[in-house]
A protein has these predicted regions:
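Residues that form or immediately flank small-molecule/cofactor binding pockets and catalytic motifs
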Residues: 8, 60, 213
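Conserved donor-binding loop and adjoining core beta-sheet/short helix segment
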Residues: 31-135
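Short, solvent-exposed loop/turn elements at beta->coil junctions and helix N-caps
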Residues: 27-31, 58, 161-164
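N-terminal charged segments
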Residues: 4-46, 52
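Acyltransferase donor/substrate-recognition loop-hinge adjacent to the catalytic core
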Residues: 1-4, 51, 139-222
Length: 222
Protein backbone atom coordinates (compact mmCIF):
# COMPACT_ATOMS: atom_id res chain seq x y z
CA UNK A 1 0.00 0.00 0.00
CA UNK A 2 1.29 3.46 -0.95
CA UNK A 3 0.29 7.06 -0.28
CA UNK A 4 0.61 9.51 -3.15
CA UNK A 5 -0.53 13.05 -3.78
CA UNK A 6 -3.65 13.25 -5.96
CA UNK A 7 -5.48 16.07 -7.67
CA UNK A 8 -8.40 17.86 -6.04
CA UNK A 9 -10.62 16.58 -8.85
CA UNK A 10 -9.74 12.95 -8.15
CA UNK A 11 -10.16 13.52 -4.44
CA UNK A 12 -13.66 14.95 -4.95
CA UNK A 13 -14.59 12.07 -7.25
CA UNK A 14 -13.57 9.60 -4.55
CA UNK A 15 -15.55 11.48 -1.88
CA UNK A 16 -18.64 11.42 -4.13
CA UNK A 17 -18.68 7.64 -3.90
CA UNK A 18 -18.44 7.49 -0.11
CA UNK A 19 -21.33 7.29 2.35
CA UNK A 20 -20.07 9.94 4.74
CA UNK A 21 -16.98 12.16 4.72
CA UNK A 22 -16.36 15.16 6.96
CA UNK A 23 -16.35 18.55 5.21
CA UNK A 24 -12.99 19.06 6.95
CA UNK A 25 -11.64 16.42 4.56
CA UNK A 26 -12.63 18.22 1.36
CA UNK A 27 -10.09 20.11 -0.78
CA UNK A 28 -12.10 23.31 -0.26
CA UNK A 29 -11.40 23.25 3.48
CA UNK A 30 -7.68 23.54 2.87
CA UNK A 31 -8.20 26.81 1.03
CA UNK A 32 -9.80 28.41 4.10
CA UNK A 33 -6.92 27.67 6.50
CA UNK A 34 -4.74 30.76 6.84
CA UNK A 35 -1.13 29.87 7.61
CA UNK A 36 -1.46 26.30 6.36
CA UNK A 37 -0.81 24.71 2.98
CA UNK A 38 -2.78 21.65 1.93
CA UNK A 39 -2.60 18.59 -0.30
CA UNK A 40 -4.98 15.82 -1.31
CA UNK A 41 -3.58 12.36 -0.64
CA UNK A 42 -4.60 8.99 -1.99
CA UNK A 43 -4.01 5.47 -0.65
CA UNK A 44 -3.30 3.00 -3.44
CA UNK A 45 -3.13 -0.76 -3.75
CA UNK A 46 -1.49 -1.01 -7.14
CA UNK A 47 -3.38 1.62 -9.12
CA UNK A 48 -6.64 1.27 -7.18
CA UNK A 49 -7.54 4.25 -5.01
CA UNK A 50 -8.80 2.82 -1.70
CA UNK A 51 -8.60 5.84 0.62
CA UNK A 52 -8.12 9.59 0.56
CA UNK A 53 -7.39 12.53 2.82
CA UNK A 54 -6.83 16.24 3.03
CA UNK A 55 -3.56 16.94 4.82
CA UNK A 56 -2.80 20.39 6.24
CA UNK A 57 0.84 21.44 6.55
CA UNK A 58 2.29 24.21 8.69
CA UNK A 59 5.93 25.14 8.10
CA UNK A 60 8.36 25.79 10.92
CA UNK A 61 10.14 29.16 10.44
CA UNK A 62 13.61 29.03 8.83
CA UNK A 63 13.78 25.24 8.41
CA UNK A 64 12.13 22.79 6.01
CA UNK A 65 10.11 21.03 8.69
CA UNK A 66 6.34 20.77 8.94
CA UNK A 67 3.53 20.05 11.35
CA UNK A 68 0.94 17.92 9.54
CA UNK A 69 -2.70 17.50 10.48
CA UNK A 70 -5.55 15.49 8.95
CA UNK A 71 -8.75 16.93 10.50
CA UNK A 72 -11.40 14.22 10.92
CA UNK A 73 -9.39 12.06 8.57
CA UNK A 74 -8.02 10.22 6.75
CA UNK A 75 -11.01 8.58 5.06
CA UNK A 76 -10.07 4.91 5.33
CA UNK A 77 -11.54 1.53 6.25
CA UNK A 78 -11.17 1.95 10.02
CA UNK A 79 -13.01 -1.31 10.70
CA UNK A 80 -10.13 -3.52 9.50
CA UNK A 81 -7.13 -3.70 11.85
CA UNK A 82 -4.88 -5.02 9.08
CA UNK A 83 -5.86 -2.24 6.67
CA UNK A 84 -5.40 0.41 9.39
CA UNK A 85 -1.88 -0.75 10.19
CA UNK A 86 -0.79 -0.77 6.53
CA UNK A 87 -2.51 2.53 5.73
CA UNK A 88 -0.99 4.42 8.66
CA UNK A 89 2.45 2.97 8.00
CA UNK A 90 2.22 4.25 4.42
CA UNK A 91 1.08 7.66 5.69
CA UNK A 92 4.04 7.93 8.08
CA UNK A 93 6.46 6.98 5.30
CA UNK A 94 4.96 9.67 3.03
CA UNK A 95 5.09 12.30 5.78
CA UNK A 96 8.68 11.61 6.84
CA UNK A 97 9.88 11.89 3.24
CA UNK A 98 8.45 15.43 3.15
CA UNK A 99 9.98 16.76 6.34
CA UNK A 100 7.03 16.26 8.68
CA UNK A 101 8.19 16.19 12.31
CA UNK A 102 4.76 15.81 13.92
CA UNK A 103 1.75 14.08 12.39
CA UNK A 104 -1.75 14.43 13.81
CA UNK A 105 -5.02 12.93 12.65
CA UNK A 106 -8.62 12.53 13.77
CA UNK A 107 -10.25 9.31 12.54
CA UNK A 108 -13.86 10.04 11.59
CA UNK A 109 -15.38 7.16 13.52
CA UNK A 110 -17.34 6.85 16.75
CA UNK A 111 -16.70 4.91 19.93
CA UNK A 112 -19.60 5.67 22.30
CA UNK A 113 -23.06 7.22 21.90
CA UNK A 114 -25.46 8.73 24.41
CA UNK A 115 -29.14 9.37 23.74
CA UNK A 116 -30.46 12.84 24.47
CA UNK A 117 -32.75 11.59 27.22
CA UNK A 118 -29.85 9.85 28.95
CA UNK A 119 -27.90 13.10 29.12
CA UNK A 120 -30.96 15.07 30.22
CA UNK A 121 -31.51 12.65 33.09
CA UNK A 122 -27.95 12.81 34.43
CA UNK A 123 -27.84 16.60 34.09
CA UNK A 124 -31.04 16.81 36.13
CA UNK A 125 -29.56 14.51 38.78
CA UNK A 126 -26.33 16.51 38.97
CA UNK A 127 -24.32 13.39 39.73
CA UNK A 128 -21.63 13.67 37.04
CA UNK A 129 -19.27 16.39 35.83
CA UNK A 130 -18.27 15.10 32.37
CA UNK A 131 -19.95 13.12 29.59
CA UNK A 132 -17.25 10.50 29.87
CA UNK A 133 -18.58 9.54 33.30
CA UNK A 134 -22.00 8.65 31.87
CA UNK A 135 -22.70 5.04 30.85
CA UNK A 136 -23.16 5.09 27.04
CA UNK A 137 -26.30 3.79 25.34
CA UNK A 138 -24.29 2.35 22.44
CA UNK A 139 -20.71 1.14 22.03
CA UNK A 140 -18.95 0.63 18.70
CA UNK A 141 -16.75 -2.46 19.03
CA UNK A 142 -14.67 -1.41 16.01
CA UNK A 143 -14.11 1.99 17.60
CA UNK A 144 -12.96 0.37 20.85
CA UNK A 145 -10.54 -1.83 18.90
CA UNK A 146 -9.17 1.22 17.10
CA UNK A 147 -8.55 2.99 20.42
CA UNK A 148 -6.48 0.00 21.51
CA UNK A 149 -4.69 -0.44 18.18
CA UNK A 150 -3.49 3.13 17.65
CA UNK A 151 -1.29 3.30 20.80
CA UNK A 152 0.15 -0.09 19.89
CA UNK A 153 1.17 1.41 16.53
CA UNK A 154 2.89 4.36 18.22
CA UNK A 155 0.10 6.95 18.08
CA UNK A 156 -0.75 8.98 21.18
CA UNK A 157 -4.00 10.71 22.07
CA UNK A 158 -3.33 14.13 23.52
CA UNK A 159 -5.61 16.35 25.56
CA UNK A 160 -7.16 19.19 23.59
CA UNK A 161 -5.87 22.60 24.64
CA UNK A 162 -7.41 26.03 24.29
CA UNK A 163 -4.32 27.45 22.61
CA UNK A 164 -1.81 26.18 20.08
CA UNK A 165 -2.06 25.31 16.41
CA UNK A 166 -5.82 24.80 16.37
CA UNK A 167 -5.28 21.17 15.45
CA UNK A 168 -7.94 19.42 17.50
CA UNK A 169 -11.61 18.78 16.80
CA UNK A 170 -14.26 18.34 19.53
CA UNK A 171 -14.28 14.80 20.91
CA UNK A 172 -17.99 14.95 21.73
CA UNK A 173 -20.41 15.91 18.96
CA UNK A 174 -24.17 16.40 19.35
CA UNK A 175 -26.17 15.25 16.34
CA UNK A 176 -29.90 15.66 15.69
CA UNK A 177 -31.56 13.00 13.54
CA UNK A 178 -33.70 14.77 10.92
CA UNK A 179 -34.61 11.82 8.70
CA UNK A 180 -38.31 10.97 8.71
CA UNK A 181 -39.29 13.91 10.93
CA UNK A 182 -41.49 16.88 10.12
CA UNK A 183 -40.43 20.42 10.97
CA UNK A 184 -42.95 20.45 13.83
CA UNK A 185 -41.59 17.20 15.29
CA UNK A 186 -38.07 18.61 15.24
CA UNK A 187 -39.32 21.81 16.86
CA UNK A 188 -41.00 19.84 19.65
CA UNK A 189 -37.65 18.24 20.46
CA UNK A 190 -36.18 21.61 21.48
CA UNK A 191 -36.41 22.79 25.06
CA UNK A 192 -38.92 25.46 25.99
CA UNK A 193 -36.43 28.34 25.95
CA UNK A 194 -35.18 27.46 22.47
CA UNK A 195 -38.75 27.32 21.17
CA UNK A 196 -39.45 30.75 22.65
CA UNK A 197 -36.31 32.20 21.08
CA UNK A 198 -37.23 30.80 17.66
CA UNK A 199 -40.76 32.19 17.82
CA UNK A 200 -39.40 35.57 18.95
CA UNK A 201 -36.94 35.65 16.04
CA UNK A 202 -39.72 34.82 13.57
CA UNK A 203 -41.90 37.63 14.94
CA UNK A 204 -39.01 40.07 14.52
CA UNK A 205 -38.60 39.12 10.86
CA UNK A 206 -35.67 36.71 10.97
CA UNK A 207 -35.81 34.30 8.02
CA UNK A 208 -33.66 31.41 6.86
CA UNK A 209 -32.92 30.52 3.25
CA UNK A 210 -30.34 28.51 1.38
CA UNK A 211 -27.51 30.78 0.32
CA UNK A 212 -25.05 30.73 -2.56
CA UNK A 213 -21.45 31.77 -3.01
CA UNK A 214 -22.67 35.22 -4.06
CA UNK A 215 -23.85 35.80 -0.46
CA UNK A 216 -20.34 35.53 1.00
CA UNK A 217 -19.32 39.20 0.46
CA UNK A 218 -22.42 40.33 2.36
CA UNK A 219 -21.72 37.83 5.13
CA UNK A 220 -18.15 39.06 5.61
CA UNK A 221 -19.26 42.70 5.66
CA UNK A 222 -21.45 41.85 8.65
Amino acid sequence: MQVRQITSERHLAYIAGRNSVSFLQTPAWGKTKTGWSSQSLGWFEGEELIGAALILLRKVPKVEKYLAYLPEGPDLNWDSSKDVEMALSALVTFAKARGVFQLKMGPHTWVRRWHAQTLKDVIAQGTVKTIGEVTPDEINANGINLLKQLPALGWRQRKAEASGFGDFQPRYVFQIALTGKTEEQIFEGFNQQWRRNIRKAEKEGVTVRQGTITDLPTFHVC
